[in-house]
Amino acid sequence: MSKQKGKRGEREVKDLHNEFFIDQGLDIRLERNQMQSAVGGYDLVGLDFLAIEVKHCEVFQLTKWWAQTMNQMKDGQTPVLFYRRNRVPWRVMMIGCVINSDKQPAMIIDIAVDDYFRWLATKLRSLKSED
């Protein structure tokens, strides 16, 4: 049951991303990492700058999940952890900056899914303008 719940969670988060990309008019699609059990890696692939891990589990182990997310990312990637329990909205943990007068220290942040997608839209626009 737990593996099925995990796969279902991965599909939900993949679909959230793909709906977002369609709404933004972007030709990007995320897929589940089918090789993760054999060779490791994060759960969703398709954007090289993100390492997305998904946890849909009743036994809450946020510290362990975050460590796994950090360990599976590659240099230059942003670690992103989507997590939730049954009947609770998805939450997102990632590295972000909190504006604090003249300094913007990077730290672990926990945000709502809508805020994550606002960040992702801004990030994709900035990457496009660099091309």
At which residue positions do the language-model features occur?
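Catalytic phosphate/metal-binding cores of nucleic-acid and nucleotide-processing enzymes, i.e., regions
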Residues: 1-131
